[in-house]
A protein has these predicted regions:
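Glycine-rich catalytic cores of cysteine/serine-nucleophile enzymes that process amide/ester linkages
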Residues: 7, 18-116
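Juxtamembrane extramembrane loops of integral membrane proteins
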Residues: 5-6, 10-12
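Intrinsically disordered, low-complexity regions
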Residues: 12, 20, 185-188
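Soluble catalytic domains of enzymes that build or remodel membrane lipids, polysaccharides, and related
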Residues: 83, 91-166, 170-173
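Generic secondary-structure boundary/loop-capping signal
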Residues: 24, 29, 34, 104, ...
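Alpha-helical transmembrane signal-anchor/signal-peptide segments
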Residues: 1-3
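Activation targets extended, charge/polar-rich intrinsically disordered C-terminal tails
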Residues: 136-241
Length: 241
């Protein structure tokens, strides 16, 4: 439900995990004020060493509210597992998961043993808010008219790039990094979309958040989102959220 800057998010995912396959499902409602949205982060998660990863985003607020995390994924049917080739033949429905970072990031760092990196995107608050509204519109349209995930034309990274173009992001229509998305951080770095105070290799090393996420989860820290951003490049540590 959207009323100006006031948005009610339904089916906001906030699972509690004991393992990757053993968890308590919890869907919540959350009220947010889009006018307090101030920045956004790109999260890249690698399930194995290589050029392919999963990318998703978090939208941050300047009033201390927890970030809103959005992940574009496939919705496999019971008994199905993701297959890249099959995804090009209308096999998997596209789904947008909106939820808590302790769920969407924590399950990857703590239970799936994925390597996760978090980068602050160089974007104005106005662009961030506009991008969030594009996501909302897309989510609402999918509820009425489902679409199919497609490895080459409708995947997690291509959609992020497509939406970013609408608010002034890089306009190159196609780049191999859109598919080999494990390199998307390098692609954005050399286009000025990430913090450039460090050489890229050092930025990447500093942006690895597994250790911080695992420590915060082990302590059941309420400030999980703040903890994983501590000392990350490009993020004001007075408001590390």
């Amino acid at each position: 439900n959207i009323h100006g800057d006031q948005v009610r998010l339904v089916n906001y995912r906030n699972f509690t995990y004991r393992s990757a396959s053993d968890f308590d499902e919890r869907y919540e409602e959350r009220e947010i004020d889009v006018s307090r949205m101030a920045s956004m982060d790109l999260i890249i998660s690698y399930w194995k060493i290589g050029p392919v990863a999963h990318t998703f985003v978090s939208f941050n607020f300047d009033d201390g509210s927890p970030p809103v995390c959005i992940s574009i994924e496939v919705r496999p049917e019971i008994g199905e597992s993701f297959d890249p080739l099959s995804s090009m033949f209308k096999q998997f429905e596209l789904i947008y998961i909106v939820g808590d970072e302790r769920d969407l990031i924590g399950v990857r760092t703590d239970h799936r043993n994925e390597d996760v990196f978090l980068y602050r995107i160089n974007a104005s608050p106005e662009a961030v808010r506009e991008l969030f509204r594009i996501y909302l519109d897309r989510i609402n349209r999918l509820a009425d008219r489902p679409e199919w995930y497609h490895l080459l034309t409708d995947n997690c990274t291509i959609n992020v790039i497509r939406y970013a173009r609408k608010v002034g992001g890089p306009h190159r229509r196609f780049d191999v990094n859109h598919l080999l998305n494990g390199f998307i951080d390098s692609y954005l770095y050399y286009r000025g979309m990430l913090d450039t105070q460090f050489p890229f290799a050092e930025l990447r090393q500093r942006s690895h958040i597994n250790e911080a996420a695992q420590a915060a989860a082990a302590e059941a820290a309420e400030n999980f989102s703040e903890r994983i951003r501590m000392n990350l490049p490009g993020i004001d540590q007075k408001v590390a959220r």
